[in-house]
Design a protein with these regions (language model features):
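Conserved N-terminal diphosphate/IPP-binding helix and adjacent helical/loop segment
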Residues: 1-56
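Short coil/turn segments at secondary-structure boundaries
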Residues: 47-50, 85-93
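Post-HEXXH active-site segment of zinc metalloproteases
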Residues: 93-102
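Short, well-structured alpha-helical segments
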Residues: 32-40, 53, 77, 115-126
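Alpha-helical phosphate/pyrophosphate-handling elements in metalloenzyme active cores
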Residues: 45-75, 101-109
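His-Asp-centered metal-binding catalytic motifs of divalent-metal-dependent phosphohydrolases/nucleases
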Residues: 59, 73-89, 98, 118-126
Length: 162
């Protein structure tokens, strides 16, 4: 089982690096890897049942199928990685804390507009409602992100129970 988790972590780390460097290829790979390691550590915290790396892996299985229709696939991917990075089961502000955390982590590498969009995407996962975005293209991408996040509710019972 631990070997399977290590494989998930390694593969997702590669995916994270691909999307990150597609936006900013000037960042040293060590810095990108450090960002990923921090994400992986957080998704492996003991209090997580559903909001784990397995959830992120499931999201990216779907993402692969639809990324070609997205206007900003790399920003959507980063929002997926960060959307549950902060998780305390008894708190109601996990999405806010995750959005703030993402912006803090990404601000040195991305534009203010890119960080704000990732923040807005993560905040939409709090109530799974589309917020007013500055363009129809961003609303389109946002809808896909929310659909992916809620897709477990339409999965088979055996998949849902995992």
């Amino acid at each position: 089982m631990i070997k399977a988790f290590a494989h998930i972590e390694t593969e997702l780390g590669k995916v994270f690096a691909q999307h990150f460097t597609a936006i900013n290829s000037d960042v040293e790979s060590e810095k990108v890897n450090n960002l990923w390691q921090d994400i992986a550590i957080r998704y492996n915290e003991a209090q997580r049942a559903y909001h784990s790396l397995q959830h992120i892996e499931q999201l990216f299985a779907q993402f692969k199928q639809i990324k070609h229709v997205l206007n900003e696939p790399h920003l959507i991917a980063l929002a997926l990685f960060y959307h549950d990075v902060i998780y305390a089961p008894t708190r109601a502000d996990n999405e806010l804390k995750s959005a703030e955390y993402a912006v803090e982590a990404l601000r040195p590498y991305f534009s203010a507009a890119q960080c704000q969009y990732i923040y807005a995407l993560i905040m939409m996962t709090a109530n799974h409602k589309l917020a007013e975005c500055s363009s129809a293209q961003k609303n389109f991408d946002s809808a896909y992100l929310l659909d992916m996040d809620l897709s477990i509710l339409g999965a088979s019972w055996s998949e849902y129970e995992q």
